[in-house]
């Protein structure tokens, strides 16, 4: 996820989210401070999937809060 200097956040479909005040793929969710602790759950083994997740985070904001390049 790209911070773009803290001024823009790309929303779903590589369209910039409303407000342009965030730093993330889904700006409407990034301000949430809620978290859950789950105990007693077995770890998930994701062998070979780390690269897939990292490759999909190529959204960067250009001028006027537009995504550039659009490859998210």
UniProtKB/Swiss-Prot annotation:
Pfam family name, one: Metallothio_2
Gene Ontology terms, MF aspect: metal ion binding
Record's keyword terms, sorted: Metal-binding, Metal-thiolate cluster
InterPro entries per the UniProt record, alphabetical: Metalthion_15p
Function recorded in the entry: Metallothioneins have a high content of cysteine residues that bind various heavy metals.
Family according to the record: Belongs to the metallothionein superfamily. Type 15 family.
Name under which the protein is recorded: Metallothionein-like protein type 2
Organism: Solanum lycopersicum (Tomato)
């Amino acid at each position: 996820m790209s911070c773009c200097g803290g001024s823009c956040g790309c929303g779903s479909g590589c369209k910039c989210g409303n407000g342009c005040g965030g730093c993330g793929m889904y700006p409407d969710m990034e301000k949430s401070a809620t978290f859950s602790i789950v105990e007693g759950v077995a770890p998930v083994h994701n062998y070979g999937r780390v690269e897939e997740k990292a490759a999909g985070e190529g959204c960067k904001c250009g001028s006027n809060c537009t995504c550039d390049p659009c490859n998210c």
